[in-house]
From Swiss-Prot:
Homodimer, forms a heterotetramer with a Cas1 homodimer. It is an enzyme of class 3 (hydrolase). NCBIfam families: cas2 (TIGR01573). InterPro entries: CRISPR_associated_Cas2, Virulence_VapD/CRISPR_Cas2. Gene3D superfamilies: 3.30.70.240. Mg(2+) binds at residue 8. Transmembrane segments: none annotated. It comes from Desulforudis audaxviator (strain MP104C). Belongs to the CRISPR-associated endoribonuclease Cas2 protein family. Its EC number is 3.1.-.-. GO terms for molecular function: metal ion binding; RNA endonuclease activity. This is CRISPR-associated endoribonuclease Cas2. CRISPR (clustered regularly interspaced short palindromic repeat), is an adaptive immune system that provides protection against mobile genetic elements (viruses, transposable elements and conjugative plasmids). CRISPR clusters contain sequences complementary to antecedent mobile elements and target invading nucleic acids. CRISPR clusters are transcribed and processed into CRISPR RNA (crRNA). Functions as a ssRNA-specific endoribonuclease. Involved in the integration of spacer DNA into the CRISPR cassette.
Length: 106
């Protein structure tokens, strides 16, 4: 099942270890503190236990969220880059698992 992992970790060293653990489990870094990928229930549980050991008593938060295919098809994203032409920015709405569609006004 697709899985989102989001974290907000105060300590740089701990945050880096969380980042590396997510990469070790085959997840893709899609935003600064957000990973996405395909994981079985058992692999999600293994990652959870590993992250719990990494964080220990340090200040921070981790969210591991399984996402079903139906909900993934309903997801939407907006991506605009600096210097992007206005026409491209208007078309920057994407739907994971589907081709990009132009945003509609109104």
């Amino acid at each position: 099942m697709k899985t989102l992992v989001s974290y907000d970790i105060v300590e740089d060293k701990v945050r880096r270890k969380v980042f590396e653990a997510c990469k070790d489990y085959g997840l893709t870094n899609v935003q600064y503190s957000l990973f996405f990928g395909d994981m079985t229930h058992n692999r999600r549980e293994e990652l959870f236990q590993r992250l719990r050991r990494i964080i220990g008593r340090q200040e921070g938060k981790v969210l591991i969220c399984p996402v079903c295919d139906k909900d993934l098809r309903l997801s939407k994203a907006i991506e605009v880059s600096a210097g992007m032409p206005e026409e491209a920015a208007e078309a920057a709405v994407s739907y994971p698992g589907r081709s990009r569609k132009k945003a509609r006004a109104g």
